[in-house]
Amino acid sequence: MAQSKLYPVVMAGGSGSRLWPLSRVLYPKQFLCLKGDLTMLQTTICRLNGVECESPVVICNEQHRFIVAEQLRQLNKLTENIILEPAGRNTAPAIALAALAAKRHSPESDPLMLVLAADHVIADEDAFRAAVRNAMPYAEAGKLVTFGIVPDLPETGYGYIRRGEVSAGEQDMVAFEVAQFVEKPNLETAQAYVASGEYYWNSGMFLFRAGRYLEELKKYRPDILDACEKAMSAVDPDLNFIRVDEEAFLACPEESVDYAVMERTADAVVVPMDAGWSDVGSWSSLWEISAHTAEGNVCHGDVINHKTENSYVYAESGLVTTVGVKDLVVVQTKDAVLIADRNAVQDVKKVVEQIKADGRHEHRVHREVYRPWGKYDSIDAGDRYQVKRITVKPGEGLSVQMHHHRAEHWVVVAGTAKVTIDGDIKLLGENESIYIPLGATHCLENPGKIPLDLIEVRSGSYLEEDDVVRFADRYGRV
C-alpha cells in the first residue's frame, strides 16, 4: 500500500512577547535568528529534510505575510503555500484551514498532516524524524497523534499528557492511548508527574489525517468547522498567499486544538519524543539551551564581560559591557534595552503590557522595519521631521503613492534609484538627491543589480506610515 501524502503544517502565529525587546508584534520570535544563522521558522522547515513530504504549508497572520514569503524564498520553499489569518483564532481553526486546503489539494485521498509550531527548538533532529516515522502507521490508521516530550525536569511552564495503555501498532512502534491532558502544574505536582514516568510534556505537535481531524472537529465543534469552511469557500488567491474570507473567519470562535478535539476524541494517542525539545518561552530558557562560555555566559554581538557569570547578553548595535554581575539578562536593540534578573524573566510580559498601556510603539514595531521591497530604519525624528535609511532590493520597487501631510527629500547613498514624480522619470546615482512635494504622485524603484540605499528626510504636520494613498502596487497592497 502506497504511503499517504504528508503535508507539513507550520503554525507561525503569535507575538512572543516574553522575548521582548527582540520579539515584537510585527516581528515576533519565530522570524528571528535566536540560534545560528537561520530563523526559527526556517529551522523548523529544514528539520523536515529527510522526511518524505510535500511542500510545507505555513499559517500566519496577514501582517507577517511578506516576512514569511521572504524566509521561504531564501530556502527555495516558496509556492502558493501561505495561509493568511485575518486575526488569530488559536490552533483549532488554524489547523482546520490547513486541513481543508490539504483536502482541496489532494481530493483523491485523505492526506496526512504533520502540525508543527514555528518557534520550537529541537536539538536532536534525528530523534524528531524517528518519532514522526513511529507515528505514521497510527495516523494512517485513523488515530490522532500528539507528540509527548519525555521530561527531564519538573517544568511548571508546560502542560502535561498522561499516558494510558499501549496502543496496538506495528512491531517496534510505540504509542500510548491518551489518558488525560493536564494544565500547567505547580512544582510539587510536576515533580510527582516526572517521578511516575507516566507523563509527557505537551509539545503542541500533531500528526493525523486531514479528513479525520475534520470529522472530529465536526463532531465536537461544528461551529468552528462551519466558519472555516465558509472562510475557505471564498479564498482570494494573492501572489503566493491563500487569503481566506475575512468576515467568515472573524466569526469563528477561538479555541485550541487540545480543547476542541484532542481532549474529547476517543482516538488520541501519544508518541514519545526525546529530542532535546524547547518552546523557548523566555530569556532564561534561551540561555539554558544556548552554548555557554566558561563563566556560564551567552553572548551575541559586540559584548565585553568582566567578572560576569551565568548571564545572557545580547547587543544588536554598538558595544554592550557588563562588570561584576551574575544571573542577568541584558538585551540591547536600537530603540530599547532590557535588564532583568534571569530568574524573573517571566515578568517581561508585564513590561510589554505597560508599554502598550502607555500608548508607546516599542511593543509593536522595531526601529528597523521589513517590507516586501526591502527595509527601512528610522534613524531620527523630531517636531515635524523624520529621517530614515531606506534599502530597496535589486529589481524591487515601492508603490505608486502620494501623501497628504508630508514632503520628502531623498539622497542616494549607494546604488541607482529610478524615481517617478507626477509622470516625470529620473535616474539618480550616488550623492544625487531629489525633492518630492506634498501631494505629488511618486514611485521609487531599484533598476540595478545591487541594493539601493538612500536617506529619506520627511517634513510636515503628520509623518506616520498611514499617511499614504496607493495607486498601484506590485505586492497587492492597493
Swiss-Prot record:
EC number: 2.7.7.13
Keyword presence, ATP-binding: no
Keywords: Capsule biogenesis/degradation, GTP-binding, Lipopolysaccharide biosynthesis, Nucleotide-binding, Nucleotidyltransferase, Transferase
GO term, biological process aspect, one: colanic acid biosynthetic process
GO molecular function, one term: GTP binding
Pathway info: Nucleotide-sugar biosynthesis; GDP-alpha-D-mannose biosynthesis; GDP-alpha-D-mannose from alpha-D-mannose 1-phosphate (GTP route): step 1/1
SUPFAM superfamilies: Nucleotide-diphospho-sugar transferases, RmlC-like cupins
Domain of life of the organism encoding this protein: Bacteria
Reactions mediated catalytically: alpha-D-mannose 1-phosphate + GTP + H(+) = GDP-alpha-D-mannose + diphosphate
Family: Belongs to the mannose-6-phosphate isomerase type 2 family.
Function as written in the Swiss-Prot or TrEMBL entry: Involved in the biosynthesis of the capsular polysaccharide colanic acid.
Protein's name in the database: Mannose-1-phosphate guanylyltransferase
Lineage: Bacteria, Pseudomonadati, Pseudomonadota, Gammaproteobacteria, Enterobacterales
Gene: manC
